[in-house]
Amino acid sequence: MATKAAFARMNGLGNQIIVADMRGRADSITSAAAIRLASDSETAFDQIMAIHDPRTPGTDYYIAIINCDGTQAQACGNGTRCVVQALAAETGRHAFTFETRAGILTATEHDDGLISVDMGTPRFDWQDIPLAQAVADTRKIELQVDPADAPVLHSPSIASMGNPHAVFWVDKDVWSYELDKFGPLLENHPIFPERANISIAHVTSSDTIDLRTWERGAGLTRACGSAACAAAVSAARTGRTGRKVTVNVPGGPLLIEWRDDDHVMMTGPAEWEFSGTFDPATGEWSRDTQGLQGSGNADRGAA
């Protein structure tokens, strides 16, 4: 019988994350285990960040990302910050290189506790997102929420940050829209063969964006780091903002910079909640006082 694995329940601006220590193990977290953990109010999460031994030379760890519906995700910026905080507390290191399904990324914990993640380069070609049909210009595609003569949401910008995003621009408060109603319909629209993350964005100044996101495989979320990046690069690409913006998500602000080398940097906090152990096959778990960060962090607040 396999031994249980350690985990830490954390959050990145309210994006609920489980950081699971799968190093030195041959097994992986099953979909059934993820769904069981997601259904428990104490361990409910948006994503699991499972830390595995490295698969590629030059990287520190491979991170498998699992949504709360048991599906695999390519990227999770908020979850990556949580992984960095957990590993920094354990190892004393502050810079890491990870491999995910979306590729290689680097991340650094700063002296003030904030964490920057290099989210890589955005992609805009319709094949790379991917879309189901050719689109000449992904800055604005034909997609809308009915009624046809006065659509509630329409003409989103499309981008990939290693995962597909649609950003709908609105001219009023993002809370004015029923994202819980429109989100699942748009996520599963036929134009997105791999489904998509759906965001509503309101540009409030040349360097500030308000954002709400329906996250693919997770639903409404208080924060989605890759969506914040997709909104920031799409805003710059369409002339709505400059290349360095604050994106205000329901959980708080993220600083996003689309650098001249085309890389997108995301900076924000992470917060430790509690630790425990769990069975990666079944999802059976228990809380303990020792975990990825040890017993001395039980009252640790936001970094």
Swiss-Prot record:
HAMAP family noted in UniProt: DAP_epimerase
Keyword tRNA processing: no
Residues carrying the site annotation Could be important to modulate the pK values of the two catalytic cysteine residues: 165, 215
Region named Disordered: 278-303
Annotated compartments: Cytoplasm
Assembly and binders: Homodimer.
Homology family: Belongs to the diaminopimelate epimerase family.
Record InterPro entries: DAP_epimerase_AS, DAP_epimerase_DapF
GO cellular component terms, semicolon-separated: cytosol
Name of the top EC class for this enzyme: isomerase
One Pfam match: DAP_epimerase
Source superkingdom: Bacteria
Major localisation: cytoplasm
Organism annotation: Brucella melitensis biotype 1 (strain ATCC 23456 / CCUG 17765 / NCTC 10094 / 16M)
Organism ancestry: Bacteria, Pseudomonadati, Pseudomonadota, Alphaproteobacteria, Hyphomicrobiales
Biological function: Catalyzes the stereoinversion of LL-2,6-diaminopimelate (L,L-DAP) to meso-diaminopimelate (meso-DAP), a precursor of L-lysine and an essential component of the bacterial peptidoglycan.
Keyword Amino-acid biosynthesis attributed: yes
Record EC number: 5.1.1.7
Protein name, UniProt field: Diaminopimelate epimerase
Catalytic residues of the enzyme: 76, 224
